[in-house]
From Swiss-Prot:
It comes from the Eukaryota. Belongs to the TMEM45 family. This is Transmembrane protein 45B. Disulfide bonds: none annotated. The chain crosses the membrane at residues 7-27, 49-69, 96-116, 120-140, 150-170, 184-204, 216-236. The keyword Cell membrane does not apply. It is found in: Membrane. The keyword Transmembrane helix applies. It is a multi-pass membrane protein. GO terms for cellular component: membrane. InterPro entries: DUF716, TMEM45. It comes from Xenopus tropicalis (Western clawed frog). PANTHER family: EPIDIDYMAL MEMBRANE PROTEIN E9-RELATED, TRANSMEMBRANE PROTEIN 45B. Pfam families: DUF716 (PF04819).
Length: 280
């Protein structure tokens, strides 16, 4: 959709997943340091299955929104009367959602007893991100300078994420790569919203001069600020997760010590009773 909603929708999807990953991966990493956490591993597997279902569902919502909004193409690619293309921008967004939907389906299939190759889920996600970058690279040709520039900045986050994910195919459970991907996903989410506010101002706000080089300079600086905020969010979430895990570990240790003490006292009582019965 060539409007504010068309950028807010994918921005919201990326933001939700980026924020979720910024909590999930630190939690998984810090819990992996605790011995005997088999139950947690099963829990994470279920969470990743749910994540795949949500990814496929979000992609389906995006496809339906792009195709069946009042001014959408309604699944028509070519106009039958003059043989012209119909709403190609909507079709590009639909294609992006399609590949993210495929990634979600692969995530789901990974947890079925099909013996799929290890890393296939990351590979499918990496392909989806590459397709997104390819589509947006040719999305704004022959458009005003500011429009081209603000979308080209998005490609930094897109292809940076794609490289990270492709490395994850071979290096699973690497916390640095996972956190890097999470930060770039948050950046994508906030930047989609920023594109919407710049190109389609709300509430009668003044329009941006698309040819002013000063605006191009500010948008570049603004992109760096967005990533700084993303890194701050990552740091805050990691710190909160660390405190929660540390507190939980401390409580578990207290409970374990209490149980050991109770069992020890119980053993001593039983031993004294047995000793008393032997004397009789």
């Amino acid at each position: 959709m060539a409007n504010f909603k068309g950028h807010a929708l994918p921005g919201s999807f990326f933001l939700v997943f980026g924020l979720w990953w910024s909590v999930k991966y630190p939690l998984k990493y810090l819990n992996s340091k605790v011995k005997g956490n088999c139950r947690s591993n099963k829990c994470y597997e279920r969470l990743e299955l749910i994540e795949g279902i949500l990814k496929a569902a979000f992609a389906l919502i995006g496809i339906l929104a792009e195709q069946f909004v009042p001014d959408g193409p309604h699944m028509h690619l070519v106009n039958g009367e003059d043989h012209s293309w119909v709403k190609l921008m909507n079709w590009q967004h639909t294609t992006m959602y399609l590949f993210y939907g495929i990634s979600g389906v692969v995530d789901i299939l990974t947890f079925l007893p099909l013996n799929l190759p290890r890393g296939l889920d990351r590979l499918s996600l990496g392909i989806a991100v590459i397709i997104e970058g390819l589509l947006f690279y040719y999305h704004v040709h022959n458009r005003p300078a500011l429009d081209q520039h603000i979308h080209s900045l998005l490609l930094i986050a897109v292809f940076g994420g794609a490289i990270s994910i492709m490395i994850e195919v071979f290096m699973r459970n690497d916390i640095v790569l996972e956190l890097f991907r999470s930060s770039l996903t948050i950046l994508q989410g906030t930047w989609f919203w920023q594109i919407g506010f710049v190109l389609y101002p709300l509430g009668g706000a003044p329009e941006w001069d698309q040819t002013d080089h000063g605006n191009v300079m500010f948008i570049t600086m603004c992109f760096c600020w967005h990533y700084a905020v993303a890194l701050l969010i990552m740091a805050i979430n990691y710190s909160l997760v660390y405190c929660c895990v540390k507190r939980h570990k401390k409580l578990s240790s207290v409970v374990d010590n209490s149980l050991k003490k109770i069992n020890s006292n119980k053993t001593e009582v039983e031993a004294s009773l047995l000793a008393g019965s032997d004397e009789e």
